[in-house]
Amino acid sequence: DPFSIINVEIKSPKSGEKDIVRKTIACVKAHHLFDRLIISSFDPRLLVEAKEIDPNTRTGFLYSPDSPVIEQVYDDPIAYAKQIHADALHPLIAYVDEDYLDDCHKSGIIVNPWTVNLEEAMRLCSEWGSDGIITDTPDVAVSVIR
């Protein structure tokens, strides 16, 4: 689908791994898919690095109760997204409701909750205006959205 977004999650690199963000961006650009890319990570440093490599890189911050920076994010997710220059927040679905989505959208922040596998949660995300979802069951998502 030429309109699909490609969400590439980058994990925190193991010691000795270098330039994973730079290599990812270069690979996506080489395949002429950069305009469809969003890089997501639980590690905000990798998202900042992506913006330093190319300020046009779209980034999404993944977070859950286990996130090392959860206190900062939980208190004010929009302020945290702006602090790290993230284009999107990718929260655990339990954090998302209609007010959360409205507040993010008013601030220009995209929201793609995860892991949205239940049909009812997919319907709610759609009704509330979620920009997208991260799911393990894309076939179910397609049938629910149609």
Predicted regions mapped to residue ranges:
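Short loop-to-alpha-helix "cap/lid" segments that border enzyme active sites
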Residues: 1-146
